[in-house]
Amino acid sequence: MLSDKKTETNIGTKKTVLFIAEAVTLAHFGRMMTLARALDPAQYRIVVASDPRYLHLEQPFPFEFESIWTIPGSQFSQSLAQGKVVFDTKTLAHYVEDDLQLLATVKPDLVVGDFRLSLAISAPLTAVPYASVVNAYWSPFAKITYPVPDLPFTRILGLTLGQKIFNAVRPFAFALHARPLNTLRRRHGLAPIGNDLRKVYTWADHTLYADIPELIPCEKLPVNHHYLGPVQWSTNTALPTWWDQFPRGKPIIFASPGSSGQDDLLPRVIEALSGLPVTLIAASAGRSDTSKLETPSNVFVSDYLPIKTAIRNSQLIICNGGSLSTYEALTAGVPVLGFTNNLDQQLNMQAVERINAGIAIRTGSTSIAQIKQAINTLLNTTRYQAAAQGAADVLSHYDGEKTFRDIVQKILL
């Protein structure tokens, strides 16, 4: 009887789950791919929608794909660096129009979004249940402090005075960044979410935190807010030809600026490591022309590397401080050196530093000497390795994909 019931469900009433990634960074696309894979295609029709800029990293593509427009990653990074509103009303209106067309075409039973803020309008307008994947440090319920980002005024006034000013103006800045979505919700007859960027980032029927409470604690969470645990992803790319040749007798360091790191990060890391007794394996993630990089004999570079494989062969990871890379490192028990250049990365690395599993450096004030010192500290101080291994032990108890499957099943019952 159970077998007959399952067959009938698969043929006649298979639910459609639509995943929408805001591809301003690779992490948002990657997390949607991981969660899409977590579902059984025999039980669900799975559709992924994204700007196609990262599609080449997931070939052959395993699901139905719908192309949508996303602002360029360079525009996103520049707005963050200048403290400007990232998604203005005009951009969000364009997104909502695209969303509505997409939802009408796919007809999903559930839409899962990663940083697609316009779904806070398009999903309720079409009465489609909406689950948002977001980091817990953006939750209004997170028990955290907010470091001042690297903004033009902090480069002039310094961090101490800049932090005091940021503490005073942050609520007003968060309200300013929340205004476009609230304006557009009113225009569509929906109530405003509130004058707080954190509420805008986390509004959904179901809010799913791609974090663990041991790293990013929250208090008094609403019943529709859930910790998933880390959502990890790696490029579906082949290992480079040099993979079997690089020396493994010295400490191995993996470095990648990611899609949102600064363009000069990898060249500076290479310069810092050129004279050290280490081996560097690196992925430019498209941020540098690898053919033009000066690579000493202890440096091996490719455009992309499977991050899971690279990290599990390394004693240290150097990255932009984003959660996708740091969770992969901590899962493997590897300490992190994070070069942060926006508030998202700083909030994530603040948590990593709090548990002594890594060191954060602001990219706007980094010398080669500082990079060398941080690398030596992380490689030669046992407390960082012990803390990273402790984090790995905690993370081993989490299964974000299973938790997601269970939540989807409850939503679609």
Residue locations for each model-derived region?
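Short, well-ordered alpha-helix to beta-strand connector turns
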Residues: 43, 62, 108, 204-205, ...
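Short, basic, glycine/proline-bearing loop/turn elements
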Residues: 21, 82-88, 103, 177-185, ...
